[in-house]
């Protein structure tokens, strides 16, 4: 919030205003000049809060402190709204190990940059009726990523693809490591195959 967006001190000129303090004080309905006098005596500012109210509402406060706190809230809100970047990497069921190594190398770089990585295995022909071959590839990838990233939920089938999202591991204090491992057991081949039916039905 800038000074151009609010009326302060001598710029406020109303016959009557409802004047309140920043800590809940109620000064009542007085002239804007009287309200300004109160603010000046306290070494504070008079800020117009609501011009449309009848009478208009003014608050006695430290405007610079108010502006700083407001700008801080806006910055924090923008950080929370920051979109997560997702990088997509396509694989095939017949991919060679050296090609997997190359693609995983890039995936790890993305994860280290705090990006999410979505691996998609292309299912060709009859493979689309049985995603086992695709899951086998994803399992190989998972073992190469497990020290740096966590799989998000289970793999899921999307038409001619079977995909799996990986996200950066949260940085936690050492005392929480044991609890984290207990709450997030590693995926294994059995779990993957059990989840295959769920993956086919999940959208």
Swiss-Prot record:
Question: Which InterPro entries did the record assign?
Answer: T_IF-3_C_sf (IPR036788), T_IF-3_N_sf (IPR036787), Translation_initiation_fac3_CS (IPR019813), Translation_initiation_fac_3 (IPR001288), Translation_initiation_fac_3_C (IPR019815), Translation_initiation_fac_3_N (IPR019814)
Among the Pfam families in the record, one is IF3_C
Q: Does the keyword Hydrolase apply?
A: no
**Where is the stretch described as Disordered?**
172-203
**GO cellular component labels:** cytosol
Output the PROSITE patterns linked to this UniProt entry: IF3
Subunit organization: Monomer.
Q: What does this protein do?
A: IF-3 binds to the 30S ribosomal subunit and shifts the equilibrium between 70S ribosomes and their 50S and 30S subunits in favor of the free subunits, thus enhancing the availability of 30S subunits on which protein synthesis initiation begins.
Checking HAMAP family in the record gives: IF_3 (MF_00080)
What protein is this chain from? Translation initiation factor IF-3
Q: Quote the gene name from the UniProt entry.
A: infC
């Amino acid at each position: 919030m800038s000074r151009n967006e609010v009326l302060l001190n001598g710029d406020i000129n109303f016959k009557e205003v409802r004047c309140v303090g920043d800590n809940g004080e109620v000064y009542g309905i007085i002239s804007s000049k009287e309200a300004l006098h109160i603010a000046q005596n306290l070494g504070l500012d008079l800020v117009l809060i609501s011009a449309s109210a009848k009478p208009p509402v003014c608050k006695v406060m430290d405007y610079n402190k108010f502006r700083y706190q407001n700008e801080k809230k806006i910055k924090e809100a923008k950080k929370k709204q920051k979109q997560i970047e997702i990088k997509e990497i396509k694989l095939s069921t017949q991919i060679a190990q050296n090609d997997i190594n190359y693609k995983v190398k890039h995936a790890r770089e993305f994860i280290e940059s705090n990006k999410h990585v979505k691996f998609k295995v292309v299912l060709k022909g009859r493979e689309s009726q049985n995603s086992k071959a695709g899951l086998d590839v994803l399992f190989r990838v998972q073992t190469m990523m497990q020290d740096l990233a966590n799989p998000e939920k289970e793999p899921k089938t999307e038409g001619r693809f079977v995909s799996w999202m990986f996200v950066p591991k949260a940085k936690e204090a050492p005392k929480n490591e044991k609890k984290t491992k207990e709450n997030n057991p590693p995926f294994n081949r059995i779990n993957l195959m059990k989840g295959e039916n769920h993956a086919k039905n999940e959208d």
